[in-house]
Amino acid sequence: YSTIINNNYNLYSQFEHKPCSDDEYDENIGFYWIKTLIEHIFGDQVELGIKYLKILYDNPKQALPILVLISEERSTGKTTFVDFLNIMFGANMVIINPQDISNGFNGSYADKNIIAIEESRFDSIQATEKLKNLATQKEILVNSKHIRQYSIPFYGKLIITSNDETKFSKVDSPEIRYWVRKVPTLKGKGNHQILSDVRKEIPQFLYYLNTLPEVDITKSRMVFEADEIATAELQTVKNESRSGLH
């Protein structure tokens, strides 16, 4: 890690956590709770979920789809997953609310690598378009209160959680920027101290990510092909958007 790169200040923050050493890695103990959480969130797409996390870790400049975790039920682990990422990525991530996207000020998230928007529903066309633009834009005009505007490269990846399973946002049929997953309830699998446990497991998990093959990031602008991340939940949202009932 270096704070200065090519005479420019590095806006990416140093990680609090480091991969464990070869001697410290124990595949029998490993990262049980992190693995359990990832499998719960991504379900039958868990391999894609691991690739997604590896890219977040290895290639912070790479654009990725907007990950949307939906469920109208309680105790699903959506917030726990966001909190886990926040622990892992530290100051490179921010958790905001939908109003922060809708208003004109973006200083809280413009320089972040991961932008999580919790319990979200975006009713206005303006907010929906802003989301889509953020997913692919390469530069952002930073607008903070009482500070002169300035431009910086933008590498933000969006994660949305919502309890609205069908109308969290308007999504047109041709849209390929969303990866929508319905998250089931934990059904007795809960661990009230899971955040403490996953924090301890992060060095083992980072070691594991480093052992995985490099992900091919050249096959699509957002790495994953549309059919790879297509889900029934995404199609339902598109159908609702097309019906005019949004």
How would you describe each model-predicted region?
Residues 169-189:
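A short helix-turn-beta junction within AAA+ P-loop NTPase domains corresponding to the substrate/partner-engaging
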Residues 119-121, 138, 164-165:
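Conserved Walker B
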Residues 2-114, 120, 179-181, 209:
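P-loop NTPase catalytic core of nucleic-acid-dependent motor ATPases
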Residues 70, 216-246:
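DNA transaction DNA-binding modules
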Residues 128-150:
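Conserved catalytic/switch belt of AAA+ P-loop NTPases
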Residues 105-110, 143-161:
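AAA+/SF3 P-loop NTPase mechanochemical coupling elements
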Residues 123-128, 170-171:
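Conserved ATPase-coupling elements of RecA-like P-loop NTPase cores
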Residues 110-113, 137, 154-157, 173-179:
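Short glycine-/polar-rich loops that comprise or flank the Walker A/P-loop
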